[in-house]
């Protein structure tokens, strides 16, 4: 699974996931499914934010990266992907500026158009079950919840899906692609089932030495949302090598 993650996701997303797991004392060599889940969640959050801006009239617009209007205000503030200290600093700043109620748990995004925090969920289970779990944990009407599944289903607070249909379709397509690529490599069942995951981990550990010398193909493209986070954790020499838009899993 670890090899798949490094091949399938942008290196910047992988590094953010590594930092997140390290911050919580988790070993990605052992918890490979969690590693994959964190990378997937990060990518969905960045895709959610990509290309969405607010114009001078306060309207939400979708703008391609190379459009000169890209200097407009970003609609979403990205909180996910930052270390906890910085994330809470961003949340506090938003609350002080907008008057929003401070959430008890760190959300993933803030929507400047709707003036609300957003919690993004990506689930391998039924969307309504995961939605209820999120809602019971957060217990706040001020945090909007939006859940995506790998099967193309979604569920959001009061059926308010925030984004336009095309933007959500991009996210659903990406999740479906990840699922298919996992299935093609025999990883999907272990990703869904903890019991299968333990079996897969043993196989992964045995095959690591055999695969160590193999070349790895990784896309060097990234989303504009990720570029916002780059200065916090990447040197400019590495940043220059990464271009806009999202990667796709390499074919076998």
UniProtKB/Swiss-Prot annotation:
The record places the site described as Important for efficient shutoff activity and nuclear localization at 195, 198-199
Tell me if Kinase is a UniProt keyword of this record.
no
Q: Name one GO biological process term.
A: viral translational frameshifting
Looking at the UniProt record, the site noted as Important for efficient shutoff activity sits at 28, 65, 202-203, 206
Where is the protein localized? Host cytoplasm; Host nucleus
What are the GO MF terms of this UniProt record? Answer: RNA binding
**Keyword Calcium among UniProt keywords:** no
Pfam families reported for this sequence? Flu_PA (PF00603)
What are the protein's UniProt keywords? Decay of host mRNAs by virus, Eukaryotic host gene expression shutoff by virus, Host cytoplasm, Host gene expression shutoff by virus, Host mRNA suppression by virus, Host nucleus, Host-virus interaction
Give the positions the UniProt entry annotates as the active site: 80, 108
Note what the entry says on domains. The probable endonuclease active site in the N-terminus and the basic amino acid cluster in the C-terminus are important for the shutoff activity. The C-terminus acts as a nuclear localization signal. The C-terminus is recruited to host protein complexes involved in nuclear Pol II RNA processing.
Biological role stated in the UniProt entry = Plays a major role in the shutoff of the host protein expression by cleaving mRNAs probably via an endonuclease activity. This host shutoff allows the virus to escape from the host antiviral response. Hijacks host RNA splicing machinery to selectively target host RNAs containing introns for destruction. This may explain the preferential degradation of RNAs that have undergone co- or post-transcriptional processing.
**Protein family (similarity comment):** Belongs to the influenza viruses PA-X family.
Please identify the protein, giving its name as recorded. Answer: Protein PA-X
């Amino acid at each position: 699974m670890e090899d798949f993650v490094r091949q399938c996701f942008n290196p910047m997303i992988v590094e953010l996931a590594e930092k997140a797991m390290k911050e919580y004392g988790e070993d990605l060599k052992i918890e490979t499914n969690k590693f994959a889940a964190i990378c997937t969640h990060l990518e969905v959050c960045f895709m959610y934010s990509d290309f969405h801006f607010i114009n001078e009239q306060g309207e939400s617009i979708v703008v391609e990266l190379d459009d000169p209007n890209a200097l407009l205000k970003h609609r979403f503030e990205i909180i996910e992907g930052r270390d906890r200290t910085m994330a809470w600093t961003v949340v506090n700043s938003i609350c002080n500026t907008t008057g929003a109620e401070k959430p008890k748990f760190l959300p993933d995004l803030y929507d400047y158009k709707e003036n609300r925090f957003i919690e993004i969920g990506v689930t391998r289970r039924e969307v309504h079950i995961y939605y209820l779990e999120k809602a019971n944990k957060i217990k706040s009407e001020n945090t909007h919840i939006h859940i995506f599944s790998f099967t193309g289903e979604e569920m959001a607070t009061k059926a308010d899906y925030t984004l336009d249909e095309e933007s959500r379709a991009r996210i659903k397509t990406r999740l479906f692609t990840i699922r298919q690529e996992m299935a093609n490599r025999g990883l999907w069942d272990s990703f869904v089932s903890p019991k299968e995951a333990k079996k897969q981990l043993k196989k992964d550990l045995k095959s690591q030495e055999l695969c160590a010398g193999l070349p790895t193909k990784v896309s060097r493209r990234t989303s504009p949302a990720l570029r916002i986070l780059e200065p916090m954790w990447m040197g400019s020499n590495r940043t220059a090598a990464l271009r806009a838009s999202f990667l796709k899993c390499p074919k076998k």
